[in-house]
């Protein structure tokens, strides 16, 4: 479908949880494991088993764990729920420990709210770590994405906005959206 990275939910409580990488996995796509409050050993074991390239951490993981996983050879993406400018400031302790930050919509539980947060808050982000924009992105989000600008914005994370049911992605909608997004003058 044209995605550069493909995420696999490694959080047992999620309806999107996967035990292993599908056999039809495109070879060029980076494999991203999504974890919530897992310990280092569990993450490393799953990363080895699934052949992961990147680790996305969506819980209350410490900067120390992010640093350890980076030192273990993985690109780490640390997610932050953004509601206020103070939420953006929480990234400070993680500077230098992650390849990317991911800014998402706060919701009960972890992930998949289908709602956007106020992207204007990200004008408060002055860090050096590039970030991914997430939370409520769907096919109708293209005009808002075209209007968004930030010097550290590196990409987007898509999930529930492209599902026909939990864990069932609409491949045609994803492909169309990704093609259009890649052609935006960002």
Model-found features: residue ranges?
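Conserved N-terminal beta1-alpha1 strand-loop-helix module at the mouth
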Residues: 1-186
């Amino acid at each position: 479908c044209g995605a550069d990275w493909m995420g696999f939910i490694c959080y047992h409580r999620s309806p999107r949880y996967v035990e292993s990488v599908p056999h039809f996995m495109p070879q060029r796509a980076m494999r991203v494991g999504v974890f919530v409050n897992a310990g280092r050993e569990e993450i490393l074991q799953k990363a080895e088993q699934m052949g992961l390239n990147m680790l996305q951490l969506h819980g209350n993981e410490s900067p120390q764990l992010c640093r350890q996983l980076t030192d273990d050879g993985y690109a780490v993406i640390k997610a932050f729920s953004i509601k206020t400018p103070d939420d953006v400031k929480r990234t400070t302790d993680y500077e230098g420990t992650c390849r990317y930050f991911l800014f998402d919509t706060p919701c009960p539980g972890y992930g998949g709210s289908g709602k956007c947060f106020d992207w204007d808050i990200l004008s408060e982000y002055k860090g050096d770590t590039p970030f991914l924009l997430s939370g409520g992105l769907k096919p109708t989000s293209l005009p808002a994405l075209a209007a968004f600008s930030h010097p550290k914005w590196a990409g987007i994370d898509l999930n529930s906005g492209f599902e026909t049911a939990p864990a069932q992605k609409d491949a045609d909608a994803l492909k169309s959206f990704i093609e259009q997004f890649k052609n935006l003058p960002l």
